[in-house]
């Protein structure tokens, strides 16, 4: 006969069976154990106050609760267990079937799962008396330290492990193995809880704003505990713990912090505490927004190697070799006439510690980098963003931008020793690639070109010809004008494999197979006034996935493009009522997949008239016109020099001048009261060979409609190689020949 489990402090009754004095409440918590059996926890009370709350929802202080494989089966499983104290349990709530899966081996502390199960079975068959004694012991209530609260359970005890000197129970499930903290408020969690109470100011019922986000006190406590210990405690757990501390009334200093917040002796202490609070929680909030936390790293010296993590660890598979391409060693500087004592304009800050940033779904980055949204369907292509902060001081006389400018960067790739043929076919340091570069001004394309023979692990210059012109042109501008010029410039570079199979010349010479694109480099710039701020920060961007469009209907789409006009920045805009779409527009459909650019050609891009644009795009166009107006401060001098170098083109110039006079009144320069700049005509083919408004038919059966091809050109290349001309235009400012090779 099993002994009856009786609470340690049963109220005394008189001879008539009545209690002496007022009846005291008896609180019983009911829970389901990990083996599906019911557990009861009895809380006796005095003076209408519960003495202590349960420390865990599954009553883990009853040593450990494990899977059925660890249990010592009862002699008669079909018999309904009888609780002499609390009555009879329903058989339907017992012996619930659980899947024993992924059982964890506890090493020296715990025996092997199979051996443990076999030993228990033999013990059941060979030692029934000892088993009965164990069951009787299990029916005895397990008490807390104060002896007032007991746990009554039918479940046998499994082996117990330890983590950071705290008992840990293993709970096998069908999905994964996990470690369960038997003490929710362990010493490290309690220490972090008390620390954060001394940081958070008391704000009554109002929430605290951190970086524009309203947070409650319990949420801040939860975030701090997770950042400090790596153990997550919910807001409800924090709230319950606060109520327990108040009810117990033992830690008066903590209760005072809960009720009144931290108290300061002087105003300086309050300011220092406020600053510390903002620093700590600003960092926690930033890490929480970016989706990572440095505090989640476990202490390797205190955690045995055989202990599992709280969840099954998802190992990062390095299956994509393109992710191993690193951008490094970037700098821009100006040397003196002897090639010594360089003045550093900017230098890379975090070449070895590049963090990833996932963009939100509503991020409008395509306004700065047209065509970037096409890469949303290509998550395997790495996108590296460089924020370049440039210092441009007043240079001494011995320094010259034209002679002393220097820039360099490298694309590093370490090929593994045992690389598979598939790995080598994707990326290899021994292969040469092509680099497509497109420069934008406030989202409008101004120049683009291709480079061949690009090799990895080699230092190369960063378009020095463009920067020499940029610094020499805008170096004398005001602080605001120079800052606006830097802010408006963005550069997109696409590294792709220039093999015969990469470009579909038989279908369209402007399309490149997406599988041949290896890397995308994005550049943004800003002007700084301090040398310590002249740093370049590198970040790996993760684009939000593109919503898949329905392909049930096959429709024919026609796109049309136009050549830039000779006498106006605005060019000849396409008719807004036409069903055709300008390929120079950045808002192309998913089937078009257009990236502005041109292979083996360099030309200027046209900007539509502001009157033909929707109201939402007009402010950006005004900024573009202001930026281009600054570029035309010296057009007459450069035009006179080019006319002296090109006397043979005088006849063609006169014919263009008459046409320019007719369009000068409608030019955007009239809005700013500026004279119409003279146009260089070296880049343009005579009118007899020019083609305007050329269109082609693009349907869903075209090879580019399956999103496997990417557009590298939005201009017609059927009238010859433009790079053979003597001049070309950059934002409607002409350059002499030889400048092309510098890019």
From Swiss-Prot:
Tagged with keyword Transcription = yes
Q: Where is the composition biased (Low complexity)?
A: 113-137, 630-649
User: Record's Pfam families?
Assistant: TEA
Q: Which SMART domains match?
A: TEA (SM00426)
Sequence ranges of Polar residues compositional bias: 1-11
Which compartment or compartments is the protein found in?
A: Nucleus
Q: Positions of the region Disordered? A: 1-20, 104-165, 629-657
Q: DNA-binding region at which residues?
A: 178-252
The record's listing under PROSITE patterns reads: TEA_1, TEA_2
Q: Which UniProt keywords apply?
A: Cell adhesion, DNA-binding, Nucleus, Transcription, Transcription regulation, Virulence
Q: Name one GO cellular component term.
A: chromatin
Function of the protein:
Transcription factor which regulates genes involved in hyphal development, cell adhesion, biofilm development, and virulence. Plays a role in the formation of 'finger' morphology, a unique multicellular morphology of C.albicans induced by carbon dioxide. Regulates gene expression during intestinal colonization. Required for the expression of the secreted aspartyl proteinases SAP4, SAP5, and SAP6; but also of BCR1, PGA4, and CDC24.
**How is this protein named in the record?**
Transcription activator TEC1
């Amino acid at each position: 006969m099993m002994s009856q489990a009786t609470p340690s402090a049963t109220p005394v009754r008189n001879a008539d069976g009545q209690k002496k004095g007022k009846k005291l409440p008896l609180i019983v918590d009911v829970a389901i154990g990990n083996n599906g059996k019911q557990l009861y926890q009895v809380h006796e009370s005095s003076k209408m106050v519960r003495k202590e709350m349960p420390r865990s929802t599954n009553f883990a202080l009853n040593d450990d609760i494990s899977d059925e494989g660890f249990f010592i089966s009862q002699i008669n499983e079909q018999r309904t267990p009888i609780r002499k104290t609390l009555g009879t349990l329903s058989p339907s709530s017992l012996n619930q079937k659980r899947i024993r899966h992924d059982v964890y081996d506890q090493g020296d502390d715990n025996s092997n799962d199979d051996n443990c199960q076999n030993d228990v079975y033999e013990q059941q068959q060979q030692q029934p008396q000892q088993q009965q004694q164990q069951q009787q012991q299990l029916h005895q209530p397990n008490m807390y330290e104060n002896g007032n609260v007991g746990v009554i359970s039918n479940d046998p005890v499994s082996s117990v492990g330890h983590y950071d000197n705290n008992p840990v129970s293993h709970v096998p499930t069908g999905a994964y193995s996990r470690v369960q903290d038997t003490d929710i408020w362990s010493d490290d969690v309690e220490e972090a809880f008390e620390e954060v109470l001394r940081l958070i100011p008391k704000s009554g019922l109002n929430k605290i704003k951190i970086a524009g986000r309203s947070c409650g006190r319990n949420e801040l406590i939860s975030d701090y505990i997770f950042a400090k210990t790596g153990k997550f405690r919910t807001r409800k757990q924090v709230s319950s713990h606060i109520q327990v501390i108040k009810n117990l009334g033992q830690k008066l200093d903590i209760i005072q912090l809960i009720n009144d917040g931290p108290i300061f002796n002087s105003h300086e202490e309050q300011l220092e505490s406020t600053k510390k609070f903002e620093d700590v929680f600003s960092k926690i909030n930033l890490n929480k927004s970016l989706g990572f936390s440095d505090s989640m790293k476990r202490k390797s010296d205190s955690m045995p190697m055989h202990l599992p993590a709280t969840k099954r660890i998802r190992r990062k598979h390095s299956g994509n070799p393109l992710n191993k391409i690193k951008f490094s060693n970037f700098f821009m500087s100006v040397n003196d006439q002897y090639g010594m004592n360089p003045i550093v304009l900017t230098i890379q800050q975090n070449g070895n510690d590049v963090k990833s940033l996932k963009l939100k779904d509503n991020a409008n980055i395509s306004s700065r980098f047209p065509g970037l949204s096409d890469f949303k369907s290509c998550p395997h292509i790495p996108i590296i963003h460089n924020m370049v902060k440039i210092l441009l001081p007043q240079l001494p006389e011995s320094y010259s931008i034209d002679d002393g400018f220097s820039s360099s960067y490298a694309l590093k790739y370490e090929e593994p020793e045992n690389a598979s043929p598939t790995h080598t076919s994707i990326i290899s340091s021994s292969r040469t690639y092509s680099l497509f570069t497109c420069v934008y001004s406030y989202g409008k394309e101004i120049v683009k070109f291709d480079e061949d023979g690009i090799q990895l692990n080699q230092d190369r210059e960063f378009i020095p010809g463009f920067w020499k012109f940029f610094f020499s042109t805008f170096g004398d501008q005001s602080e605001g004008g120079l800052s606006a010029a830097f802010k408006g410039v963005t550069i997109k570079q696409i590294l792709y494999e220039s093999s015969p199979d990469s470009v579909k010349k038989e279908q369209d010479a402007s399309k490149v197979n997406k599988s041949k694109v290896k890397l995308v480099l994005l550049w943004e710039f800003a002007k700084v006034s301090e040398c310590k701020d002249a740093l370049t920060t590198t970040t790996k961007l993760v684009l939000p996935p593109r919503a898949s469009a329905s392909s049930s209907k096959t429709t024919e789409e026609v796109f049309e493009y136009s050549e830039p006009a000779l006498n106006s920045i605005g060019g000849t805009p396409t008719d807004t009522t036409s069903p055709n779409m300008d390929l120079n527009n950045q808002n192309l459909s998913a089937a078009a997949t257009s990236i502005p650019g041109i292979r083996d050609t360099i030309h200027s891009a046209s900007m539509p008239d502001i009157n033909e644009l929707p109201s939402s795009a007009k402010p950006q166009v005004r900024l573009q016109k202001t930026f281009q107006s600054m570029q035309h401060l010296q057009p007459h001098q450069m035009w006179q020099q080019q006319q002296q170098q090109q006397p043979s083109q005088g006849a063609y110039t006169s014919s263009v001048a008459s046409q320019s006079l007719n369009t000068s009144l409608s030019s955007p320069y009239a809005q700013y009261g500026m004279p119409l700049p003279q146009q260089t005509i070296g880049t343009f083919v005579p009118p007899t060979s020019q083609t305007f408004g050329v269109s082609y038919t693009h349907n869903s059966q075209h090879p580019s409609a399956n999103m496997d091809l990417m557009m590298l050109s939005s201009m017609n290349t059927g009238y010859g190689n433009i790079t053979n001309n003597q001049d070309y235009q950059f934002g409607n400012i002409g350059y002499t020949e030889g400048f092309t090779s510098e890019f």
